[in-house]
Amino acid sequence: MSWQTYVDDHLMCDIEGHEGHRLTAAAIVGHDGSVWAQSATFPQFKPEEMNGIMTDSNEPGHLAPTGLHLGGTKYMVIQGEAGAVIRGKKGSGGITIKKTGQALVCGIYEEPVTPGQCNMVVERLGDYLLEQGL
């Protein structure tokens, strides 16, 4: 299965039980900042934005004072799981990033999708990739 298929079929799919509700954008990005696959709507990001996310995954709390920036959008960092999940909020939307052994699984949402639904979609794929040694 291609990385693009993971994005299209597992991240940008309808949310279980909520037909028509899906993430706004999603991507799988290597720890080095290279994009493995992304939705057409995923923002163009700067290398320093991805570096900040990687630093926070290794040093939890790094982004809390400045916020998480992706594609020029600033998200307020909210509770996550140290070294595993970073969550951010902006207005009625937000972002979830799950770190695996080799990649970052990223999902961006807006209402009517809820933070919990975004977390479920992103973390489910991230957990699967971890189980596969990725």
Swiss-Prot record:
Keyword Cell cycle: no
Compartments in which it is found: Cytoplasm, Cytoskeleton
Residue positions where Phosphothreonine is found in the record: 114
SMART domains in alphabetical order: PROF (SM00392)
Superkingdom of source: Eukaryota
Pfam families recorded: Profilin (PF00235)
Signal peptide feature range: none
Chain location of the short sequence motif Involved in PIP2 interaction per the record: 84-100
Maturation and modification: Phosphorylated by MAP kinases.
GO cellular component, one term: cell cortex
Disulfide bonds: 13-118
UniProt cross-references to InterPro entries, sorted A to Z: PFN (IPR048278), PFN_euk (IPR005455), PFN_sf (IPR036140), Profilin_CS (IPR027310)
A GO molecular-function annotation: actin monomer binding
This protein's UniProt keywords: Actin-binding, Allergen, Cytoplasm, Cytoskeleton, Disulfide bond, Phosphoprotein
Principal subcellular localisation of the protein: cytoplasm
Subunit structure: Occurs in many kinds of cells as a complex with monomeric actin in a 1:1 ratio.
Note in the entry: The variability of the residues taking part of IgE-binding epitopes might be responsible of the difference in cross-reactivity among olive pollen cultivars, and between distantly related pollen species, leading to a variable range of allergy reactions among atopic patients.
Family classification: Belongs to the profilin family.
Function: Binds to actin and affects the structure of the cytoskeleton. At high concentrations, profilin prevents the polymerization of actin, whereas it enhances it at low concentrations.
Protein known as: Profilin-3
Gene source species: Olea europaea (Common olive)
Classification of source organism: Eukaryota, Viridiplantae, Streptophyta, Embryophyta, Tracheophyta
